[in-house]
A protein has these predicted regions:
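Active-site metal-coordination/substrate-binding segment of hydrolases
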Residues: 77-111
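N-terminal helical capping/dimerization or prosegment-like subdomains
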Residues: 1-90
Length: 111
């Protein structure tokens, strides 16, 4: 099986996981002692790390400031940076900003 076939075989799982993350209102909130960016960003980080664990990664949450996932051992690693917080949600959305909308086979929409 080539890489394209492998990726295609994981499409539904990837979209399901993306939907799990999009459903979380991760706008900057009121800081709390253990949630420096508020409740929403902490929930998004927790869910993102949970998804990574489900995929077989070891995860680390750094006091809800950020987290990372890793796999394997050794001196050389590959790092991929991303974020789960979002800008404020206004009212000009064509679709629900907290739901992954599927439009046919090849188009997915969200915020």
């Amino acid at each position: 099986m080539d890489i394209k076939e492998q990726i295609h075989g994981l499409t539904e799982e990837m979209l399901t996981n993306l939907g799990r993350l999009v459903a979380i209102d991760s706008q900057l909130g009121t800081p709390a002692e253990d949630k420096p960016f508020g409740e929403g960003p902490a929930k998004a980080l927790e869910e993102g790390l949970k998804i990574a664990q489900e995929l077989g990664f070891k995860t680390v949450n750094l006091d809800n400031y950020c987290g990372y996932a890793e796999m394997g051992e050794g001196d050389e690693i590959v790092g991929i940076a991303g974020h789960l917080d979002i800008v404020p949600v206004g009212g000009d959305w064509s679709y629900d900003p907290f739901k992954l909308t599927r439009e046919g086979e090849d188009r997915k929409s969200t915020r």
